[in-house]
Every structure is written in C-alpha cells, then in structure tokens.
Amino acid sequence: MDYAPIIIGDQVNIAPKVEIYTASPHSITDHRLVARPITTIKDNVWIGCNVCILRGVTIGHNTIIGAGSVVTHDIPANVIAVGNPAHILCKLN
C-alpha cells in the first residue's frame, strides 16, 4: 500500500466513526503512485459522525462537514458541506 500524510490543524473536532483514507491499496504493486497527496484538515473544523474523507483533499478553516458525508474533493473555508459527494450547503459568516 502507498500511504500519504495527514495534516490536522488546531481546534479540530472529529466525531466517532470518521474515516480518513490515505492509502492506495492497488493490487498491481509495480505501479505505485509517485505523488503522495497530502490530506489537510485546517483549523476550527468540525467533522460529524460517519464522515468519509478521501486522500488528497483539503478542508478549509472554520468548516463543518455534516454527518454521513463523503468528502471527495477540496472544501473551502467558512462553509457547511454535506452529502455524498459532499457539497456546499451554505456559507458561514
């Protein structure tokens, strides 16, 4: 498996059963990924129960990820994101 780093900022709240995937369990061992994308969760983020975060995404500052969401791409700062795939529900002031 190829593993990649995770960066978690300050004041990040992670609820139970959150999964953060950084590995690529590709069965063809001769074709490993050269780039190991970093998964980044910035400061003041709240991640609800049963959220799945895929490798290489960035979740911006002051963001809420709703329970059961699947984060497949970057989520900007100051938003609430929900769903599968996660999308912006609203912006926070």
Protein language model features and the residues they cover:
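Conserved acidic donor-binding loop of glycosyltransferase catalytic domains
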Residues: 21-22, 66, 72-73, 89-91
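Flexible, glycine/small-residue-enriched loop-and-beta-strand segment within the central core
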Residues: 1-58, 84, 92-93
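C-terminal end-helix/capping segment
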Residues: 75, 80-93
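Residues that flank catalytic or metal-binding motifs in active/ligand-binding sites
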Residues: 16, 67, 77
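Beta-rich strand-turn-strand
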Residues: 49-73
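Short-chain dehydrogenase/reductase
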Residues: 46, 64, 80-82
